[in-house]
């Protein structure tokens, strides 16, 4: 029986600090979900239009990484990170003052750009200091800590909205940014030595080389489909849980957070099992759980069981997502040995750009009730399973090497 290789204390400390940075993106998504119906009423617009504030955030999060990745390979990790957090803070404050939809969309776009820079740095720093099994374990540990965001953020956001309104939620995001900025300035070192920095010249050729590498492209597409599933869930959950299942904003935050625990548990399981089973097998197992969970939720809702069927089904699906996410991320990032900032940027851009398509589709389908939304999730789960199987079949040697000693 294999013994799990423990991560050094320095890596654990780095992961904790990086996780606080990585939380900014998910918190910017999850914390204000319960507020969307109230935001639509106050801004005199539709729920679908308010959902655009999530869509533009995701598009900026994806597209912004393409611009930021080469910068971090050229300038190092630390200075761009601090700049990105500062932009995130200012944009959150601006969003809290929005009195019309256009202002909100502009502020959220800027906030997404700031979050994009932070995500590129987080992914790159992990690969700066680790590779192979240790990188996979670090990614899993990172996802475990970051997994607290979908658990806590909706509950905190729901409570803030219930007592102080949605503007307080945006100010809470700004406060989280300030805390992250202080922690990063004090405890996150530069991880890219000057000797390893690269010129931004030929950026398009670098991106083309990475994108055409099947060892990168297949796990990147599978990971993108996984996030598409996640944002399809996020895009419809607020309306379906509150309108169709009768939950209040605060109750929705608690229920949504409870299903988010599954992502946390899945990431923990992935970190513990990766050395024994390898990332390929874990990713296939996780994707199968996603499909099964979504299918169970759909069948239960169709049979009239309502929220009693949907929540357990989604718990299974999101547990599988937590397993698959870290494994696929390690496979994609492990495919490259240089220009890691650009690799992380391209991975994030593909992931977030495709994921952003899920939220307006899910929001539109959820207007028709739970069944169309859950059918959409099941189809997305089928896509995840197909892409993950393709990744595992085409990359058996590469995948196994990440899971071996």
Task: Label each region the model flagged.
Residues 65-76, 266-279, 366:
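Helix-to-loop junctions at the C-terminal end of transmembrane segments
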Residues 87, 91-94, 102-110, 308-316:
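Paired small-residue
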Residues 42-44, 76, 97-103, 114, ...:
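Helix-breaking motifs and short loop linkers at transmembrane-helix boundaries and internal kinks
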């Amino acid at each position: 029986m294999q013994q799990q290789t423990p991560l050094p204390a320095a890596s654990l400390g780095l992961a904790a600090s990086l996780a606080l940075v990585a939380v900014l993106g998910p918190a910017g998504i999850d914390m204000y979900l319960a507020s969307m119906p109230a935001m639509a009423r106050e801004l005199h617009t539709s729920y679908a239009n308010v959902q655009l504030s999530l869509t533009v955030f995701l598009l900026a999060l994806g597209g912004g990484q393409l611009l930021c990745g080469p910068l971090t390979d050229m300038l190092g990790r630390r200075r761009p990170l601090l700049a990105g957090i500062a932009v995130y803070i200012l944009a959150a404050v601006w969003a809290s003052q929005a009195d019309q939809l256009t202002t909100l969309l502009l502020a959220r776009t800027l906030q997404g750009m700031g979050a994009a820079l932070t995500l590129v740095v987080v992914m790159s720093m992990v690969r700066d200091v680790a590779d192979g099994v240790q990188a996979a374990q670090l990614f899993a540990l990172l996802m475990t800590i970051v997994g607290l965001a979908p658990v806590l953020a909706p509950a905190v956001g729901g409570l803030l909205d219930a007592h102080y309104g949605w503007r307080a939620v945006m100010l809470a995001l700004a406060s989280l940014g300030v805390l992250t900025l202080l922690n990063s300035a004090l405890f996150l070192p530069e991880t890219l030595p000057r000797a390893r920095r690269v010129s931004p010249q030929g950026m398009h050729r670098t991106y083309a080389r990475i994108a055409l590498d099947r060892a990168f492209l297949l796990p990147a597409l599978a990971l993108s489909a996984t996030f598409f599933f996640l944002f399809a869930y996020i895009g419809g959950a607020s309306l379906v849980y509150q309108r169709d299942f009768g939950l209040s904003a605060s109750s929705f935050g608690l229920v949504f957070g409870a299903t988010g625990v599954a992502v946390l548990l899945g990431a923990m399981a992935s970190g513990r099992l990766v050395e024994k089973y390898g990332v390929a097998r874990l990713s296939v197992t996780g994707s199968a759980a996603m499909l099964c969970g979504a299918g169970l939720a759909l069948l239960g809702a169709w049979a009239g069981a309502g929220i009693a069927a949907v929540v357990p089904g989604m718990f299974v699906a999101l547990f599988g997502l937590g397993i698959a996410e870290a494994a696929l991320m390690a496979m994609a990032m492990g495919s490259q040995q240089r220009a890691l900032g650009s690799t992380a940027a391209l991975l994030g851009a593909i992931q977030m750009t495709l994921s952003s398509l899920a939220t307006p589709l899910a929001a539109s389908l959820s207007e028709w009730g739970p069944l169309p939304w859950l059918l959409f999730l099941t189809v997305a789960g089928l896509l995840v399973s197909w892409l993950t199987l393709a990744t595992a079949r085409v990359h058996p040697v590469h995948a196994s090497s990440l899971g071996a000693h």
